[in-house]
Amino acid sequence: YNFCTNYLAGDMSPKKYWKFKEPYEGIHKLDKRIEKNLELVEKFVQLGVPRKHIIISGHSCGGLLTLMLLAAHPDKVGGGISYMQACYGKLSKKYKVKKVGPEEALAKFAKKYPGGAELRQRQINNIKKSSNVPVLAFTHPKDQYEGLLSDWLEEVPGVKRIIISEDFKINKKTCVMKGKDWEENISKQKSPGHKMNQADCFQFYNPLK
């Protein structure tokens, strides 16, 4: 559902995404998505679904949205699952986090896109301010987006972070992505670390009985 709300645009130009230098003014599209998700939650509750049985989940930008929603409204649902939260491009890869470290990499990002960097940090700070964020957060160190910029999750009360693996296997099982008439080792995909939750090996975290 998070991705079905792509028609929602923030108050600033939707074409800018994070590539703006001025401080973000108005309501960001992620905040608008939160409101739409909360509206959907209330519809389910009105149909008789217990709040504690409703779990919000999202991948990438949807993963960040999940964290933001649960930080602001921890009692509205039973909890959340965030997969590879990221909404500001391939920061780990582009700014060479592994080589220069998070601090220097984020400083370079802030120099190039001060508005985007400020908004990202503001969102993180708001999440960290919450007294309880009941979210299971999956990250991968080889995620080109924020794989090496996710340690802040360890500071968020209520968040349980799972670092999936150090390579493209889970529990020694090779990870394969499958479609209707194709399958491919995830290591051959673009941004494989960002897609680990879409591979068959990820079933390890939700074993079939």
Give each language-model segment a name:
Residues 43, 47, 52-100:
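Primarily recognizes the serine-hydrolase "nucleophile elbow" in alpha/beta-hydrolase
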Residues 27-34, 59, 63, 116, ...:
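Solvent-exposed, acidic/flexible segments
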Residues 4-31:
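Cap/lid segment of the alpha/beta-hydrolase catalytic domain
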Residues 157-209:
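C-terminal catalytic histidine-bearing segment of alpha/beta-hydrolase fold enzymes
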Residues 1-5, 53-57, 79-83, 135-138, ...:
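Structural recognition of the beta-strand scaffold that forms the well-ordered cores
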Residues 87-164:
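The feature captures the conserved acid-bearing segment of alpha/beta-hydrolase catalytic domains
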Residues 21-48:
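Alpha/beta-hydrolase active-site loop
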Residues 7-11, 60-64, 86-89, 141-145, ...:
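Solvent-exposed loop/turn segments at secondary-structure junctions
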